[in-house]
Swiss-Prot record:
It comes from the Bacteria. The keyword Acetylation does not apply. PANTHER family: GLUCOSE INHIBITED DIVISION PROTEIN A, PROTEIN MTO1 HOMOLOG, MITOCHONDRIAL. Homodimer. Heterotetramer of two MnmE and two MnmG subunits. NAD(+) binds at residues 273-287. One of its GO terms (cellular component) is cytosol. Keywords: Cytoplasm, FAD, Flavoprotein, NAD, tRNA processing. Belongs to the MnmG family. The keyword Protein biosynthesis does not apply. Gene3D superfamilies: FAD/NAD(P)-binding domain, GidA associated domain, C-terminal subdomain, tRNA uridine 5-carboxymethylaminomethyl modification enzyme MnmG/GidA. Its main location: cytoplasm. This is tRNA uridine 5-carboxymethylaminomethyl modification enzyme MnmG.
Amino acid sequence: MMTYDFEYDVIVVGAGHAGCEAALAAARMGCRTLLLTINLDAIALMSCNPSIGGLAKGHLVKEIDALGGEMARNIDATGIQFRILNTRKGPAVRASRAQADKQLYRLRMKRVLENQDNLHLKQGEVTALYCDGSVVRGVDTRSGIRFLGKTVVLTTGTFMRGLIHIGLTHYEGGRAGDLPSIGLSDQLKQLGLQVGRLKTGTPARLDGRTIDFSRLEPQHGDNPPQPFSFSTERITMRQVPCHIAYTNERSHDIIRSGLDRSPLYAGIIEGIGPRYCPSIEDKVVRFPDKDRHQAFIEPEGLDTVEMYPSGMSTSLPIDIQIAFYRSMEGLERVEIMRPAYGIEYDYVDPIQLHTSLETKAITNLYHAGQINGTSGYEEAAGQGIVAGINAALRTRGEEPLILSRSESYIGVMIDDLITLGTKEPYRMFTSRAEYRLLLREDNADQRLREIGYRVGLVSDAEYEGYLRKRDMIQAERERLAATRISMSQAEEEYFTARGLPDLQKGTSYEQLLRRPEITYDDLLSFDTVSRETPSVVREQVEIQIKYQGYIERQLEQIRRSAKLENTPLPTDMDYAAINGLTTEVKEKLTKVRPDTLGQASRIPGVTPAAVSVLSIALKAHAGARKQG
């Protein structure tokens, strides 16, 4: 084994969506960073759907951007259809989604990585960690090179012992066309980490020239398209539509006829699949009364005929795939360019991580992405930027960045993972966040820009832009509170026409906006200053005013829980010796080893009474250490 003659501060293993954000974060913070990947031509490759964002996932992308990450800027530069989802619902659950030109997305991210100072890209398969006792010191590659590093971030995706299934045929692979990673997960087991098995899948890729789009429902994007990044002024890529197709009873009969050759139902696949993204055979079996299922036919790019049938993932044999796709209206002559497949892979139970995403068993080793049991590019990227930041902070000897549940969806996700663990692929939903009215897409920069600037990921220009926006929001709120309607003839006629004749002279614009039937657009009809206010400021101000009571209530809940969240628990706490805790609670606390009292309170089975006992024991523990 040859030892490379350079010691890195941070080594990132894997160049998917988690690895790219981790490597960029560390390098931008001034760390000498190495990004290792099995295939340099597959950096940031969209292995499944060619899209970014969606319900709750869009929130994650906005948060990554606010922290100084790259995903939002990358999709803004390569997106070919943008939509805001849930526009008829409240602001807490509105979400951005964009179709990507799959190849342009990959190529742009690779170019960003290549042009980043302090970042080295190398192709190589990591087969083992190089450890000194319980401290990681570097990585070993199949080509016989040992790279030394102060910290290591593992972002292995679906590659650890990856096994691809198409019907009863199966073969090793990290994804179609790429080799798996063999040996690394076995070593992680030997190091004391609990390794499990999960499964995911992807649909076939269809030849768009063989689809009759005139018989499908077109779905157009928003006009004008709204960017993800707070730094993007406008979208310049050509925009294209998607289309909607449906299965039918004949499709379902074909699928049922192939279940005996489905690895999912033949008992061949051991791993647990994603609950919220089931395969088409799973949908047909679980919902026998449903006479059709929707499929979104999504283009994979502007310069390709490949189409992605979203909602149609499967591991059925290829003859069944061809038959059921061709049973759908508009797809009768469709040709499959790449078959659908399922894939099993190893993951490491995230309950074994600190809030910083550092493993508890191995010092200086961080995990991010699907290795932690999550699904989705956005979930991976959110973990990646946090792991990269914390690996960099470790090399500086600084305290880790901990994002709380009350300030970000990334914080909710990490807390869920390290507190509850997961036995199935985890995906983010707005319902997982108890403070979701505070964690909106539109205010991600107001929540996280300061943090990104403090750690060194947000540029001076971006930070100044954030400060200008923040000050404009505050100034506009003050103006609306101070400006009152005079009930001029124009105002009186407008309010009467809107069915509001009871308005009194002297009512402030702020009081006016609190009414559910009045929007900021109404102010534009008679207030010239409002017409000059930027739309992003108008949006923030209107939400803050209309939901002020609910927002204040959630802020009060956060203040009440702050003491628990800010009380750390010692790593050497002997929970088994604490009198007053049940055996069940002692076992759960010993297994999870929570970082704070707040985290302990969210472990299933740990009651408020147990938290009180734990708080008393913590004070006694602190007193004993002082005397010692």
